[in-house]
């Protein structure tokens, strides 16, 4: 998985419905990018987020937007935390980061709700 969505503990605790809605919107946008990359690129170009339509379309087609359900998000965090620790950029272990800084319940619920 390439991307991470982060929210403060306090916000997520106080606003679980808003948190889940935001995550759902992002995941649905991923599905639009996968199902209709031309539409997604038009929106990016029209809003000035991308200049070259051909390059943006090629990129949109090559990125695995529809595969978010297939990724093991915990394994991804573990992998990158280990690399960051090996590089001396963090001191926490991957296990501590996962135990103290992750909450998979929204992703797991949406995997069930948003059937692919």
Annotate each language-model stretch with its function.
Residues 14-91:
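Secondary-structure end/capping motifs
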Residues 2-18:
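A bilobed periplasmic-binding-protein/Venus flytrap-type ligand-binding module shared by bacterial periplasmic
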Residues 1-2, 51:
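A glycine-rich, aromatic-flanked flexible loop/lid motif
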């Amino acid at each position: 998985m390439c991307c991470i969505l982060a929210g403060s503990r306090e916000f997520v605790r106080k606003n679980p419905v808003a948190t889940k809605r935001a995550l759902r919107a992002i995941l649905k946008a991923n599905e639009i990018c996968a199902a209709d990359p031309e539409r997604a690129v038009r929106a990016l170009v029209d809003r000035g987020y991308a200049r070259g339509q051909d390059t943006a379309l090629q990129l949109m087609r090559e990125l695995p937007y529809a595969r978010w359900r297939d990724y093991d998000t915990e394994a991804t965090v573990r992998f990158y935390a280990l690399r960051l620790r090996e590089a001396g950029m963090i001191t926490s272990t991957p296990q501590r980061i996962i135990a103290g800084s992750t909450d998979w319940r929204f992703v797991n619920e949406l995997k069930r709700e948003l059937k692919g």
